[in-house]
Amino acid sequence: MLSRKCGSLSLTLKNFNSTLSVAYSASDAALKIPIADPSENAASKYANKPAKTLNDAVRERSERFRSRVYTAKIPKLHEEQVSSGFSSPCNKLRSFLHSRDYMAFLVELTLQSRMDENFGAKMFQNNDLSIAEFSAFIEGLLSVNNLLHKLSATLPNVSGTEMVFSLYQLYLKTVTPGPLSPLQLHDFNKFIRFFIRSAQLRKAQTVLDCILKSNNNQLPCDSATATHYLQLRCGALPRNWKVLDENLGRSTRLGARKNRYQLVSHSYKALDHKSVLTFMSLLSDPKSVWFHRKSAALESAVVYSLGFMGQLKLLEEHVWRNWGISLQEHNQVTDASFTSPSSEVLVAVLTSYASNKNISSALHLIDGFMAKYPTLELDHVFWRRLFQWSTRVWSEKTDPRGELSRGCWRVMREWHAARNRQLPADAVLLNERFVVLSRTNNYRDAIEVVEQCYSSFFQKANLSRHEAVLFQKFAKLILKNMAHLGYYHKPLKFIKEWSPNKLLEHTLRAYFEKHRNAYSARKQRRTEAAQKAQKRFDDEEEDSMLLGRLW
């Protein structure tokens, strides 16, 4: 067990991977949901600007992909039709779908819908495009990385979220009254996930309301839907939480420093404080249908909801009932019937406690998880969150030597060493570690980071700009301290051994020489000052001796 104490901070550290339910419509498992006004949880709304560039965009993308479509292997029966161009908009859509050009599909569909408001309905009524094909398009489109960024680059004058919401409204025309089919439920959850990631929580609430209304205001027994309900109604979206940052001295959104296409909502709050208690009971009861529907995402959402509401006592009870881990040593359960949690659950536990200014309890529980479940797999996201929280809650006043971050590093190192694994070369994690090392001026631990992690970085063909800049930060911290301590051969050896290229080697050498010269000049000034002081002392001694003789 690793223990560190600094001021009032007492830490205990030790050796420390969403499913869709097809049978979602089980009436005995559906949950009655309290009615809430989703408009209270509104996110910023884009204006629906006129899309004068749609026609041009479709034409450009059509020309770009036409050659690929034409040269595809197709039966001779259709060669004349294809060679003469697209005979109809629906043929265009099918071509885009088959070539997996989902962006062009969306642009063309939007253009046709604006020219003819009934285009979507006619398309499905005439069976020009099947529901399965349309679902495949939605699956492909909403799986595109940075979709909003790519839409804004293709159509700079059009709101990407409004285009996707119009797509959802078109999809509604295919839905008949009654419970949704498993495919429809899956597609609706894809829409919700997209709107959540785009910080369009009002639109996500609208889709969720449609799911609930189709099921008589009951929650279908489906893991993904339940997860989204907890995220939208019960506070299980930590990216939108507002938490105090000790380093900044003010509260910030947890997701505020993520990439600019992972947006956060500034009006996030919990609308339902009761359903999470129901989920706690159902997920802990082996006789419940929900017990067999639970997933890592759903379990994490319950933990996040309790953390957002500040219900740490209920959270401790939930952890104890589901995994046999307690903050009280005598309450630990050794029953082998418990199943090891996922890394995602531990991230939720850590975030829930740390956001309530109780990271020591989070670390104690994590210590218990690692002791009870030796086969527990902790992915890079867990270690990243651990260091992000250790930096966010760290205060130089209570922990001037950065023992919290150092303890987390030691635990991570020992966990990987016990499994004969290399430490993760994660730039985000290393940047969090550097923040503490630089502010505590700890160059020795910085050397350890470079020696244990950067060999993985240098195995890559090319370092990214961010990785190169981060390495320079570590190297400069080390070289500056070595220079100030009077080292010469040791820093030169470090530069030669760890510089990934000649350019960086030259930069680091010049940086070291600069601080080495400053050290030499400072040493020279001190020597001269000492010599002058000694001379004054000698002169005073000589004068004293002369005066003594006179007496």
Curated annotation (Swiss-Prot):
Keyword Hydrolase among record annotations: no
UniProt-annotated stretches for the region Disordered: 530-551
Short name of any one Pfam family annotated for the protein: ATP13
Keywords for this protein: Mitochondrion, RNA-binding, Transit peptide, Translation regulation
Biological-process GO terms, alphabetical: regulation of translation
A single GO molecular function term of this UniProt record: RNA binding
Superkingdom field: Eukaryota
A single Gene Ontology CC term: mitochondrion
Quaternary data: Binds to the 5'UTR of the OLI1 mRNA.
Family: Belongs to the AEP2 family.
Protein name: ATPase expression protein 2, mitochondrial
Species, as recorded: Lachancea thermotolerans (strain ATCC 56472 / CBS 6340 / NRRL Y-8284) (Yeast)
Lineage per the UniProt record: Eukaryota, Fungi, Dikarya, Ascomycota, Saccharomycotina
